[in-house]
Amino acid sequence: MKRSMYAGHVRKEHIGRTIVLKGWVSRRRDLGGLIFIDLRDREGVMQLVINPEDVSGDVMATAERLRSEYVIEVEGSVEARQQANDKLATGAVELKVSGLTILNTAKTTPFEIKDGVEVSDDTRLRYRYLDLRRPEMLESFKLRAKTTHVIRNYLDNLGFIDVETPMLTKSTPEGARDYLVPSRISQGHFYALPQSPQITKQLLMNAGFDRYYQIVKCFRDEDLRGDRQPEFTQVDLETSFLSEQEIQDIVEGMIAKVMKDTKGIEVKLPFPRMAYDDAMNHYGSDKPDTRFDMLLQDLTDLVKEIDFKVFSEAQAVKAIVVKGHADRYSRKDIDKLTEFAKQFGAKGLAWLKVVDGAFTGPIAKFLTGVKSKLTESLQLEHNDLVLFVADTLEVANNTLGALRTRIAKELDMIDMSQFNFLWVVDWPMFEWSEEEERYMSAHHPFTLPTAESAHELEGDLAKVRAVAYDIVLNGYELGGGSLRINQKDMQERMFRALGFTAEEANEQFGFLLEAMEYGFPPHGGLAIGLDRLVMLLAGKDNIREVIAFPKNNKASDPMTQAPSLVSEKQLEELQLQIEHHD
């Protein structure tokens, strides 16, 4: 029989109609001879009533066989419920069953198919097809589908062309680790799965496409955490002849449209802008969460003359004030914060409490001479807790930025209903890598340096600034973009600054340098992490919740057991041998 509608769509206006529904048994109850079934499908749950006085013996026998997650087809008439269930959209009606067919049976599931079930992540991923049956999971993927639909329509209406770029590309340096694919035909050679379509989308601008977009899979072989996966999806944009401001305006309009159409929220435009240096100095992060205060305070000059070498000899002394919550933190709690701080390079964590106007704590005696200045500077009051880090500026900022976020979560200081977007601009072009002992691109080596700082490509690389911009939401980097280099000599200077010889640059990027000899237009763009955006829209804290079949923290799939061993024949065809090292 043909399904009449989704179970979750049945309403009062359907009373009196005979309909056919199909779905899964969510729950079965026997009450006084009557059998009640909660039938679940993609759109919701509908109560079925099977009365032995109204159905044949065969139907009743079939109903008695039903168990959770059986797949069934039912026919019956829609009736008003004697007692409505306000918790269900279908709660005013029920289906009086006249016909019932079991389409498939089901084993007892390893966990209940319901929201809020407590089960390990690996079990959820092992039985992902069951996990995805849960209503909250389905809602997240409806939200994801709606988001991509809005984005496509918005960009289509602005004249962007949706173009697919290659999945098998060339491995290049200056990025995360590549996923490599061996070539059977060109033995000993490898493709790389793209970390982004960066170069190919730039070449589309050289081809005259003017406005490109793509919702595209990307791959990075990097350490995983809550908002990262080895394969992820990004909304990728590139434009020709537009300024930094014009590109940001397009992106803001797109985000505003997504927020309005998916959440019913009007966001204020334009988004605030914050310089990179201000973000680091005041929030201790290049992706600041502006939903709460507790900004970093620079006390370097104020404590320079005190008799406490940890402070007086440090490059930077910075602090955060936990207002009105000193009594929430015991010595043991602060010891835990200290261990947390050490993860970010801090040697320790100094602290004091304000109790009835007096300073208490291990360093209080050293601050007697600056007590009034410190009280005024930090606007200290009773029951305030002050946490200090004395170290390099970078360590102080990073440590206090992480503490700021941790404490705000511990104390429920964050308004979770807020969506605070902002642009972080005026980025440094390079960042120093302790591991590599050299400067590396803060974004990528195709970013345009500012006209005012480009001369430092042959001088002090720390002074080179980029025409780059990141869009941030609630402490997460949603995406990043920039204007790009479009002239060969500038691109060659950039490669030299990064330590490439002319031969290495030509070997890795010769095709791009050659393309720049054929009238490459000024261009720029941006990429937004779709998984991360949907995660935040859905109120989740892990992008696994909005990816249908994600990997776990070991980059493996407990369901399919990927990655897996392959046959000797496959390895022979690729001329590969596996060496095992103890």
Curated annotation (Swiss-Prot):
Subcellular compartments: Cytoplasm
NCBIfam families assigned: aspS_bact, PRK00476.1
Protein name: Aspartate--tRNA ligase
Record's keyword terms, sorted: Aminoacyl-tRNA synthetase, ATP-binding, Cytoplasm, Ligase, Nucleotide-binding, Protein biosynthesis
Reaction equations catalysed: tRNA(Asp) + L-aspartate + ATP = L-aspartyl-tRNA(Asp) + AMP + diphosphate
Family membership: Belongs to the class-II aminoacyl-tRNA synthetase family. Type 1 subfamily.
Binding site for L-aspartate: 174, 220, 443, 484
GO MF annotations, alphabetized: aspartate-tRNA ligase activity; ATP binding; catalytic activity, acting on a protein; nucleic acid binding; transferase activity
EC code: 6.1.1.12
Complex formation: Homodimer.
Recorded superkingdom: Bacteria
Cellular component annotations (GO), alphabetically ordered: cytoplasm
Binding positions (ATP): 220-222, 229, 477, 529-532
Record organism: Streptococcus equi subsp. equi (strain 4047)
Chain intervals for the UniProt region annotation (Aspartate): 198-201
GO BP terms: aspartyl-tRNA aminoacylation
Stated role: Catalyzes the attachment of L-aspartate to tRNA(Asp) in a two-step reaction: L-aspartate is first activated by ATP to form Asp-AMP and then transferred to the acceptor end of tRNA(Asp).
